[in-house]
Amino acid sequence: MDLIPDLAVETWLLLAVTLVLLYLYGTHSHGLFKKLGIPGPTPLPLLGNILSYRKGFWTFDMECYKKYGKVWGFYDGRQPVLAITDPNMIKTVLVKECYSVFTNRRPFGPVGFMKNAISIAEDEEWKRIRSLLSPTFTSGKLKEMVPIIAKYGDVLVRNLRREAETGKPVTLKDVFGAYSMDVITSTSFGVNIDSLNNPQDPFVENTKKLLRFDFLDPFFLSITIFPFIIPILEVLNISIFPREVTSFLRKSVKRIKESRLKDTQKHRVDFLQLMIDSQNSKETESHKALSDLELVAQSIIFIFAGYETTSSVLSFIIYELATHPDVQQKLQEEIDTVLPNKAPPTYDTVLQMEYLDMVVNETLRIFPIAMRLERVCKKDVEINGIFIPKGVVVMIPSYALHHDPKYWPEPEKFLPERFSKKNNDNIDPYIYTPFGSGPRNCIGMRFALMNMKLAIIRVLQNFSFKPCKETQIPLKLRLGGLLQTEKPIVLKIESRDGTVSGA
C-alpha cells in the first residue's frame, strides 16, 4: 500500500509553497524580542507560547519570572507580549503614560455592540464612557445602594441556614454564586431574583450562558492564532457574547427603562437607574450621553466583570477563615463589637472594620482574580531603557508579583497582618494590584469591596465555618485560563446558635 499520495508535481509545489507561507506567517514576529535583547521562552510557529498555559497562566508567569528576571518577552500566537515587573515601569504604563501610550486593553475577539462597554472601549470612546459612568460609582451613590445589597445578604443567610439544617457540607460556590447573581442582576437591571431557589428564571439562565467563558477553548485559540479572522467574524455578526443572551438583555433593559420612565414617583439608586438618569442629565453636555445600546453594554459588562469574581473571592475568603480559625474568631469579634446583637451593617460601620479590610486584602493578594493586567502600546516608546515597539502588549503578572517573597515574606501563608495600618507603608501600590491601577483601574472596585464585605459580615454574624473530610487542603487551582479551584470548596457550617452541617 502506497502511503504517499500520487499527486501531480504542481500540487506538491502548491502544497510546499502553502506550508512555507504558513510557516513564515506563523513565525514572522517571533524574532522581535531576540532582536531587542529581551529574554524569554522559545515560541512555536503559529502557536507562540500558548501551549504553556495548559498548566495555568499563573504557573507560566511565575516560572518565567524566576527564570528570566524583571522583564521577559513571549508570544500569544504571533502577538508579542512584554512582561514587566519593575514597579516604576508598571507606574509608567498604568499611570504616567496611560492616556498617551497605554490607553487600551488587548482586543480579545469579535464583540459586536459590546465594543462600547467600559472594559472594552478604546481611546476617546473609553474616556467618554468612563467620565459618564464615574458619578455612578461615587461613595454617595454606593451608600444609597447598601440597602439593595443588604437585602440579598439576608437571602444569603436564609439559604445558608437551610443548608446548615440539612446537616450536609456546603459547596460555597453554589451559595455565593447565587448571592453574586442576585446582587449583580438587581443593581444592573433592577430585577429581583432569588437565583438559588429560582434557577429556571430567564435572567439566571441567560446570565449563566453569558459566563461560560474559557480563554483556552478552541474558538479563542483560533482567534489568537489567526487574528485576521476577527474583522470577518464582525462582518458576519458573530460575537463571543452569545446573540440570544445579548438579545434577551437588550429587550429586558428596553422594557425596564420604558416602565421606569412612566413611573417617575419611585426613587431608585441601582446602576441601571443611575445610567438612565445620566442620559437625561444636563451635566453630561460636555460628553455625548450614553445611547440605549451603550447602556445595555455597560449592564452586560457589569455582570461579566462582577459575577464570577465576587463569588470566587467570597469562597476564597471563607476557605481561608475556615482553615485559620484564629483569624475567623478575631474577625467575628470585630464584627460583634461594631455591630452588637447582629445589628444590620451600614456603609459607615463596614468602613470601621479594619480587620475585615485586612482579611479581604490578604485574600486578594493570594488569589488575585485578575491574574494579569494588560495594555497595548499605541506607539514606539522607551521606558527605563527598554524599547517597546507599537503593537506590543505590555503585561503585568499580578499573580507572580503577589507571590514574590521579595515583597511578601512567606508568600503562600495567609497573614492578614501584612495589611495592618503599621505595615501599609511597606506595600507598593504597583506590586499589589488586585483591581489594577491608574485611570483605567476597575471602576467598580469600591462597589465590589462593599458587596463582598457586606456578605462576609452577615454570614459571620450568623455562622462559623470549619473544614470537613471533603475539603481540599491545601487548595489546588484549576489548570486553565481563569483563577478557579480544581475542586469545589466544601466546608462544614455551624450556626452560631448551635445548628451544625457536615458534621
Swiss-Prot record:
Keywords: Endoplasmic reticulum, Heme, Iron, Membrane, Metal-binding, Microsome, Monooxygenase, Oxidoreductase. It is found in: Endoplasmic reticulum membrane; Microsome membrane. One of its GO terms (molecular function) is monooxygenase activity. It comes from the Eukaryota. Its EC number is 1.14.14.1. It is a peripheral membrane protein. One of its GO terms (biological process) is steroid metabolic process. Induction: By polychlorinated biphenyl (PCB). It is an enzyme of class 1 (oxidoreductase). Its cofactor is heme. It catalyses: an organic molecule + reduced [NADPH--hemoprotein reductase] + O2 = an alcohol + oxidized [NADPH--hemoprotein reductase] + H2O + H(+). GO terms for cellular component: endoplasmic reticulum membrane. PANTHER family: CYTOCHROME P450 3A5, CYTOCHROME P450 FAMILY 3. Catalyzes nifedipine and nilvadipine oxidations. Belongs to the cytochrome P450 family. This is Cytochrome P450 3A8.
